[in-house]
Amino acid sequence: MESNDIIYQTVSYIARHFREEMSLERMARDLGVSRFTLSRVFSGTFHRNFNQFLNEQRLNYAAIHLECSDESITDICMNAGFESQRTFNRVFRERYRMTPREYRILYKEKYLREEQT
């Protein structure tokens, strides 16, 4: 498999499966490549490791749902593929410098201000 094919397959696979329990080993097996090859794709192409890339996809999903839905934060966390609310809160805070609850409140306040102008 060519490098560009592996990159495409990797992005496509994660887009389809990020909400499920996932590991580098399982993904490599499903794509028919070695763990080492897949690990090189993440570091060389995306400049991050597998878990960092996966968490980014999950956080993007969660942020959209925090902004646009009234789902509970726990439901959003679980639907995004995080195994625990504790992990979700930690990873979310690392990226956004606030809790998911604070993010939701901030976004809704911003949205209300924009509607009033």
Language-model regions, residue ranges each:
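Short coil turns linking two alpha-helices in DNA-binding domains
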Residues: S34-R35, E83-S84
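Short, surface-exposed linear motifs at loops/turns and structural transition points
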Residues: A28
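Short hydrophobic/aromatic patch on the recognition helix
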Residues: L38, F42, T87-F88, F92
